[in-house]
Amino acid sequence: MKRLTLGDVCKKASSNIAQKDLQDKIGAYPIYGASGLIKQVDFYQQDKEYIAVVKDGAGIGRTMLLPAYSSVIGTMQYLLPKEGIPIDIKYLFYAVEHMNLAKYFSGATIPHIYFKDYQKEPINIPDIETQRRISRIFDKIDALITSRKEQRTKLDQIVKSRFIEMFGDLADPACDWPQSKLTEVCADPDDIKCGPFGTQLNKAEYRHEGVALWEIPQINAQFRVEPTHYLDFDKAAELDAYSIIPGDIAMSRKGNVGQCAVFPCDYMPGIIHSDVLRIRVDSGKMVPIFMMYQLHYSGTVKRQIEQVSSGAIMAGINVTKLKSIMVHLPPLELQEQFADFVTQIDKSKYRQEKCIGFFQCLEKSIRQEWL
């Protein structure tokens, strides 16, 4: 096995194609950008399978293995194997992906990376048959991960179908479930509350342990990822009005506005971040899991949330107005039946997550050993 550098085994090539120039181009050849396929055009720049790296802007350092007879736009860069060095393109792709090229970024406004910097990355080059064998192993692991993710998506679709089956289309004018203001399904108006302002909590008060501070990334992951920041117990007690306890619904009020998750029953109470909004429903009127899915699936509720969100640069929910949005109140027994169904589906999703995590750890271990 040879230990070389990326620059020893491949060369760069540039694209001068701007996405704005593709509007009138129609054909059979794919052209790609940082987010994937843009469209089919009537030309191509590469006639062999190749690697593309995002070199400018969002997604910088992301690596793609792309087909022959295709192209990329100017924010990406081609990596092409050099002649005379036997190398499997898939092996090269997995090796480059493992390098985490984003660490070479520079530029504050528009980040970018340069081949002259990352070409120094070391790469193991075994014989060609070993390269192909390693590539096949990674292909199989990736296929298993993709399959599990697809199963997880199907489980989400099953929950949505069950919601509609049990409660109908809540946006339909013919829907006859009683309605109530959101604040009226809470025991107290202050049960709907956004996190503490910067004057009440600043970053200097963050700790590495203590009481968890729950932020938007954790909500987006349905609380399946660990908190990044903590508060000491005295500070948490001072901010008790902004607590989150099992059964509370946490909602992002900035960025991905309206994304929400129910705080798990086996978690210790924490504090919500200023970008997070807490909804603590009265369990005698509304089941939290049903309420969360109503926030996700009801077209009527989603439109109301859009109306109470404002901001020219970044939307943010107006909490006072949110308290007055109208929600549906099906019989509590029906809500509980739906919540029980979701609990069973969540167990299946958890098993899929564990499998995905296992395969990802396996892949990482193999990359560290072989690449």
Which role fits each region the language model picked out?
Residues M1-I17, D21-G33, K120-R136, T146-S147, ...:
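Non-catalytic DNA-recognition/assembly elements of restriction-modification systems
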Residues P30-G33, K39, I51-V54, Y78, ...:
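Short hydrophobic-aromatic micro-motifs
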Residues S70-Q77, T109-E129, H208, P269-L277, ...:
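A short glycine-rich beta-alpha junction/loop motif
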Residues I17-D21, I38-V54, A58-S71, I89-Y91, ...:
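Short, ligand-facing micro-motifs at secondary-structure edges
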Residues G7-K48, M64-L66, S71-G74, T183-K203, ...:
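Sequence-specific dsDNA recognition surfaces
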Residues E83-D88, D266, V281-V287:
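Ligand-binding loop in jelly-roll beta-barrel domains
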